[in-house]
């Protein structure tokens, strides 16, 4: 049996401020740092180890992974970073407060942008100061590869491309893998692994910094999945609450 651990980054500063974040590189809040330490302690107490780790090129996911591995005394584990594991790009919504955006455009429209799988928010323009193409971390991307906005289908496409080319082969070779990423990135992976319908993924929420374990067969088909707490597996349908750590 193969085990895969997925973890959404701890609470970020813009999660705290209720802003659309996307590819904006904001850091963890103090609460997010605590959540990451707690996740590492949970994994260590439950006897988990890893051979390789994957994350995005955004510091909230990277820092979460660093803290988790540090808490587990696994700082030596190789870490691979790739933009294809970035959060969904929210286009011109990035940086905007979600409540204020709902007042401006209407709650229904904002809900469609956030939760439909194939509707993109308004795009950034290339002269927008929020346009990240010139950031050094993206220097290998061609102009046509760089998103100005994304729907969940767009996010899923790049995430699964990286899954099939890099992560799945490691799992099939017996490596113990952890992925520290973002809400919509993990939603994309869960949709694929569990073969969820479009309606099923719309209502799917991924909590910050709670380890989600997938037990997979030799063909990487899921046997079962569950969240972890200090007390072990959490009953199906339940999500453990964070403790101060």
From Swiss-Prot:
**Which protein are we looking at?**
2,3-bisphosphoglycerate-dependent phosphoglycerate mutase
InterPro entries per the UniProt record, alphabetical: His_Pase_superF_clade-1 (IPR013078), His_PPase_superfam (IPR029033), PG/BPGM_mutase_AS (IPR001345), Phosphogly_mut1 (IPR005952)
Tell me what organism the protein belongs to: Bacillus anthracis
Where substrate binds, per the record, is at: 8-15, 21-22, 60, 87-90, 98, 114-115, 183-184
This molecule's function is given as: Catalyzes the interconversion of 2-phosphoglycerate and 3-phosphoglycerate.
State the SMART domains in the record.
PGAM (SM00855)
The UniProt entry, under NCBIfam families, shows: pgm_1, PRK14115.1
Q: Which family does it belong to?
A: Belongs to the phosphoglycerate mutase family. BPG-dependent PGAM subfamily.
Q: Which residues form the active site?
A: 9 (tele-phosphohistidine intermediate), 87 (proton donor/acceptor)
Q: Which UniProt keywords apply?
A: Gluconeogenesis, Glycolysis, Isomerase
Give the domain of life: Bacteria
Record GO biological process: gluconeogenesis; glycolytic process
Catalyzed reactions per annotation: (2R)-2-phosphoglycerate = (2R)-3-phosphoglycerate
């Amino acid at each position: 049996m193969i085990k895969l651990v997925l973890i959404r980054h701890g609470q970020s500063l813009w999660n705290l401020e209720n802003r659309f974040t996307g590819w904006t590189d904001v850091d963890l809040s103090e609460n997010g740092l605590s959540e990451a330490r707690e996740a590492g302690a949970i994994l260590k107490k439950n006897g988990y180890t890893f051979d390789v780790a994957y994350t995005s090129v955004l510091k909230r996911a990277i820092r979460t992974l660093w803290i988790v591995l540090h808490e587990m005394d696994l700082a030596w584990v190789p870490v691979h970073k790739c933009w294809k594991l970035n959060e969904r790009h929210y286009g011109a919504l990035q940086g905007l407060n979600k409540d204020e955006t709902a007042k401006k455009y209407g709650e229904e429209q904002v809900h469609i942008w956030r939760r439909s799988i194939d509707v993109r928010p308004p795009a950034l323009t290339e002269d927008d100061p929020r346009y990240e193409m010139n950031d050094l971390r993206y220097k290998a991307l061609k102009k046509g590869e760089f998103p100005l906005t994304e729907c969940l289908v767009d996010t899923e496409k790049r995430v699964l491309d990286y899954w099939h080319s890099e992560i799945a082969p490691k799992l099939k070779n017996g490596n113990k893998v952890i992925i520290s990423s973002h809400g919509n990135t993990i939603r994309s992976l869960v949709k694929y692994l569990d073969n969820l319908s479009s309606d099923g993924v719309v209502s799917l929420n991924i909590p910050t910094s709670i380890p989600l374990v997938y037990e997979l067969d030799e063909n990487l088909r899921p046997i079962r999945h569950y969240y972890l707490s200090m007390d072990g597996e959490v009953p199906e349908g339940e999500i453990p609450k964070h403790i101060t750590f």
